[in-house]
Amino acid sequence: MKGSEFQSKWRAYCRLMRIDKPIGSLLLLWPTLWALWLAGKGIPDTKILIVFVLGVFFMRAAGCVVNDYADRRIDGFVKRTASRPLPSGLISERESKILFVVLVLLSFGLVLTLNSMTIWLSLAALALAWVYPFMKRVTHLPQVVLGAAFGWSIPMGFAAVSENLPLVCWLLLLANICWTVAYDTQYAMVDRDDDLKIGVKSTAILFGQQDKLIIGLLQLATLVLMVTIGWLMNLGGAFYWSILLAGALFVHQQKMIAGRERDPCFRAFLNNNYVGLVLFLGIFISYL
């Protein structure tokens, strides 16, 4: 393979794994860090932290690969996804399957350094990552499955740090599911017209004209659950200030999606990175 061909193939692999679009990895990373800090009541063990951070990026990449493989026959009909490596022919189906297996093996190799409880929970994480891309064909609620997939690092984090799954763990998972459904509905609003044409289901289609209201209710539920977690964990004032700031960001997002236009809806989705960040900073500062 010539140098130029290698570079072209490498760029295609990077695009398939979304290395050029880190937003998904960040949205997966923040709940992971929330869980690790809450479970450890402060900075977790360095080895556990490294394993989870690397695992986030490997599993997010694996999720993108299986998502594009599942959507390979429909992505060409959607404006935003038509140029992806699989529908455009830059990566073959066989190459994508090999890449998925490699990424999963790397992730599982990391998990094997943790306790048995975390290893067993990781099997559910793999199942969720595999199932999610296919759910949009059978239900209007694939975003709920995505929320569980993106949040499964929460029980895994508690298991790795404390070998315990307390009430706070499940409340945090529920908060993350509410938040994920809210921001991924914003994301789905970008593709709603295309999805209607090709028969792909989403919460954006299910919610219809009530989309903004339901997103707002989900955002409110996220904040209420985070307040409850703060109370149960006796977190300091910094955490509650971070919740107020997250609420302000949610209000800003509501303004962005008010016209249901593609670009503002996508910017609202991207804005959720700051929500995850400020909530983590609130937890982090509370344990200083």
UniProtKB/Swiss-Prot annotation:
EC numbers on record: 2.5.1.39
Localization per Swiss-Prot or TrEMBL: Cell inner membrane
Transmembrane regions: 23-43, 46-66, 98-118, 141-161, 165-185, 213-233, 234-254, 268-288
Topological category with respect to the lipid bilayer: Multi-pass membrane protein
Gene3D superfamilies the UniProt entry points to: UbiA prenyltransferase
Chief localization: membrane
Cofactor field: Mg(2+)
Pfam families for this protein: UbiA
Origin superkingdom: Bacteria
Keyword RNA-binding: no
Record keywords, A-Z: Cell inner membrane, Cell membrane, Magnesium, Membrane, Transferase, Transmembrane, Transmembrane helix, Ubiquinone biosynthesis
GO biological process entries: ubiquinone biosynthetic process
Keyword Ion transport belongs to the record: no
GO cellular component: plasma membrane
GO terms assigned for molecular function: 4-hydroxybenzoate polyprenyltransferase activity
Pathway(s) of this molecule: Cofactor biosynthesis; ubiquinone biosynthesis
Matches recorded under CDD domains: PT_UbiA_COQ2
Catalyzed reaction equations: all-trans-octaprenyl diphosphate + 4-hydroxybenzoate = 4-hydroxy-3-(all-trans-octaprenyl)benzoate + diphosphate
SS bond partners: none
General function of this protein: Catalyzes the prenylation of para-hydroxybenzoate (PHB) with an all-trans polyprenyl group. Mediates the second step in the final reaction sequence of ubiquinone-8 (UQ-8) biosynthesis, which is the condensation of the polyisoprenoid side chain with PHB, generating the first membrane-bound Q intermediate 3-octaprenyl-4-hydroxybenzoate.
HAMAP family cross-referenced by the UniProt entry: UbiA
PANTHER family found in the cross-reference section: 4-HYDROXYBENZOATE POLYPRENYLTRANSFERASE, MITOCHONDRIAL, PRENYLTRANSFERASES
Family of this protein: Belongs to the UbiA prenyltransferase family.
Protein name, entry field: 4-hydroxybenzoate octaprenyltransferase
Species of origin: Yersinia enterocolitica serotype O:8 / biotype 1B (strain NCTC 13174 / 8081)
